[in-house]
Amino acid sequence: MKFLHIEDSTYDLHRQWAMRLTERMGKEYMRIDADMLTATADADGFSQWLQDEGVDLIFISAECNKRIIQRFLNACRSLRIPYVFLTDSMRKMPVLAEQETALHQILAPVTMLEEEVYKSEILGHLSRYTGAQITLLQAKDYGQRAQHNAGKIRTFLAHQELPVEIVMAKKDSLSVYKEVPSRMRDLTPDMVVLTASREYGLDDLFFGPAERYVILHSIVPVMLVNPRGDLFSLCD
């Protein structure tokens, strides 16, 4: 199986980091130019092409520009595999420099939405192959759904004897994603893992989805996992 690197902007550090993580995860590295997306005509065609090629994960190197990022977000909304954004604002970070492993610390915000628990699987894979510590940033809600989701993720990872801790956020589920960039200095992650929006609401259409905000303001790579209705039962 393969990890695919789509390059809209080319930075050697992006490529080096993506290749190291691919090697660490025991996958084959494959690289294409972003123009390949236009050859598939639509999102469904792109998804089918990835399936035919046996791609398990995508890296996307792109300029830190909201229209460019949104174009890739739109293209990836139907994907059933994780995808990682690497923007030019991340290219000088120590995490992208030469080091033994690509990941030491992974930050994953957790909201009240049930699909958050699906991140457990990819967090487990990343931690198992890289040895990275997982930090769950639990939304500060009045209800207990975010706490319940964070607890289920922690239990899943703990059963595999993987390092995980829960940190309480300052904001609730509606705003915790926008807290993520400001917490990168004190929590020092090497990657952020987010659940993409189910559907875009009016605020998302006017101001952009929360995941785009994180990507535009992040100083480390950002991985997105699309919510999948057929997997919501995992959260019951």
Task: Describe each PLM feature range.
Residues M1-E28, P94-L137, G143-Q160, L231-D236:
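Short acidic/Ser/Thr-enriched loop-to-helix initiation segments
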Residues H5-D8, T38-T40, I60-C64, P109-M112, ...:
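Structural motif
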Residues I6-L57:
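Extreme N-terminal leader/targeting regions
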Residues K27-A34, V55, I81, A132, ...:
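Short glycine/serine/threonine/alanine-rich loop segments
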Residues D33-D42, K140, I166-L174:
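Short beta->alpha junction loops
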Residues D42-F46, K119-I122, E179:
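Well-ordered alpha-helical segments embedded in enzymatic catalytic cores
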Residues G45-Q99, R183-D236:
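Gly/Ser-rich helix-loop-strand patches that form or flank binding pockets
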Residues N149-E199:
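Glycine/small-residue-rich hydrophobic helix-like segments
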